[in-house]
């Protein structure tokens, strides 16, 4: 695989395939099913096109509230803004 040419302008970067996430849940009958098959809800091109961040999944606490897919709704609606060390990456 070769390095991208020039700054990154889209996600995924030119020449790279989509990252895939597979999240499971339960249907009304209690059977395990796939809830999503995508590449995440939050992508950021950073450092003037030299890097890309892709947040695959995040939660609001521990233990994770998985009832009625509350964790998936939270991850979709709340982009991660702080990481270890409280560095604000996405402003």
Swiss-Prot record:
Pathway it works in: Secondary metabolite biosynthesis
EC class of the enzyme, as a word: oxidoreductase
Superkingdom: Eukaryota
E.C. numbers: 1.-.-.-
Keywords linked to the UniProt accession: Oxidoreductase
One Gene Ontology molecular-function label: oxidoreductase activity
Similarity field: Belongs to the virC family.
Function noted in UniProt: Highly reducing polyketide synthase; part of the gene cluster that mediates the biosynthesis of annullatin D, an alkylated aromatic polyketide with a fused dihydrobenzofuran lactone ring system that exhibits potent agonistic activities toward the cannabinoid receptors.
Protein name (database record): Oxidoreductase anuC
Species assigned in the record: Penicillium roqueforti (strain FM164)
